[in-house]
């Protein structure tokens, strides 16, 4: 996600607003969200980070604070257009700008993404490929990037957004040249070249409730399991709007499509955008949606964690993509914590108090 691609508006249930709980006191919230998530039984609570804001020291002091965010995702720096801008020429600079400080900070990394229909270099999109030659290009790309980041990634989003909302395969260079089996090839290449123990994910938006798209992903996984194609998890991106968002029960049911098959899940790109200008009612609704989303992960034993798609409003992808919408993140332009932040902290604190499970 971010900057250069546009989501279809999701056909989701209207979420009703609810009063926001009082902000936790300093004594009550000695830990940041990452620390609270661990106590609540999650592996992580993390954030996406984009390279364009790395010169802002106030931003980076939060982004690379393991107590606040104990996991990071490079929102753009590991995508094909940056990693292999020319065929066979690899440039890891943008990825390293996020991976290296996160390693120093002791944070977990979800690496994103080997294969997507967007943010591809021109040499790739304009090439005259056959099925065989394009598969060779794909394998070579995954081999080099996986080798470079060997041991650095808890998980890789191997394939990103392969389905349309109606559950059919998305028409793109991969499908049109290779056929739907390109997804299988990508996962087999990823298992072959990533370090042992790396979790391999399918990642998509619009699958946060049971619908044609999430059922298509489930069918893909069932087929993979029958034929021993490696896959470990499903990422539910979770880009929501204040006016239309799935209910807590929707997100739980969607996760169970995949956890029932033995896979882990994660909320991988959570944000909640609203129509501008903001007001108290919209802010309260946003806080509830954030809280319900995080609670849906805390309450699902095989949900490993939550990643917000950046935490600071000025660098959110939303305003550039959806005219008149914004303020989708946990912190405002002045780095003030919004009601949504405190609502998330409250959910995680309650999860810890309730003895919510599992050690990772």
What role is predicted for each listed range?
Residues 24-75:
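Boundary/entry segment of secreted carbohydrate-active catalytic domains
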Residues 28-36, 63, 84, 122-123, ...:
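Aromatic-rich peripheral "rim/lid" segments of glycoside hydrolase catalytic domains that contact
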Residues 34, 67-85, 93-207:
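Substrate-binding cleft and catalytic face of glycoside hydrolase catalytic domains
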Residues 47-60, 80-93, 163-168, 207-215, ...:
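Acidic-and-aromatic substrate-binding clefts and catalytic sites of carbohydrate-active enzymes
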Residues 93-108, 177-200, 211-278, 291-299, ...:
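Glycoside hydrolase catalytic-domain groove-lining segments
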């Amino acid at each position: 996600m971010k900057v250069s691609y546009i989501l279809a508006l999701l056909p989701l249930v209207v979420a009703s607003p609810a009063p926001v709980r009082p902000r936790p006191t300093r004594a009550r919230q000695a830990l940041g969200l990452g620390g609270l998530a661990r106590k609540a039984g999650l592996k992580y609570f993390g954030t996406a980070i984009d390279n364009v804001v790395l010169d802002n020291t106030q931003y980076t002091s939060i982004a690379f604070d393991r107590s606040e965010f104990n996991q990071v995702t490079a929102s753009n720096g590991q995508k094909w257009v940056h990693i292999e801008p020319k065929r066979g020429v690899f440039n890891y600079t943008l990825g390293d700008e996020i991976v290296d400080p996160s390693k120093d900070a002791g944070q977990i990394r979800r690496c994103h993404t080997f294969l997507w229909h967007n943010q591809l270099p021109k040499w790739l999109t304009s090439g005259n490929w056959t099925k065989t030659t394009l598969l060779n290009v794909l394998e070579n790309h995954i081999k080099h990037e996986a080798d470079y980041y060997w041991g650095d990634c808890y998980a890789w989003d191997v394939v990103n957004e392969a389905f349309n909302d109606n559950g059919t395969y998305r028409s793109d260079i991969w499908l049109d040249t290779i056929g739907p089996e390109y997804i299988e090839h990508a996962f087999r290449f990823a298992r072959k070249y990533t370090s042992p123990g790396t979790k391999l994910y399918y990642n998509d938006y619009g699958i946060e409730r049971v619908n044609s798209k999430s059922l298509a992903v489930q069918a893909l996984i069932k087929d993979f399991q029958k034929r021993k194609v490696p896959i470990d998890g499903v990422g539910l991106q979770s880009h929501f709007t204040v006016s239309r968002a799935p209910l807590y029960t929707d997100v739980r049911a969607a996760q169970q499509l995949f956890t029932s098959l033995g896979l882990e899940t994660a909320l991988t790109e959570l944000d909640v955008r609203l129509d501008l200008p903001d007001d108290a009612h919209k802010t309260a609704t946003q806080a509830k949606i954030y809280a319900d989303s995080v609670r849906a992960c805390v309450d699902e034993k095989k949900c490993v964690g939550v990643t917000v798609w950046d935490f600071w409003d000025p660098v959110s992808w939303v305003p550039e993509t959806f005219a008149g919408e914004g303020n989708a993140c946990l912190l405002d332009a002045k780095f003030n914590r919004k009601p949504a932040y405190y609502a998330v902290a409250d959910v995680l604190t309650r999860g810890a108090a309730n003895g919510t499970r599992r050690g990772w």
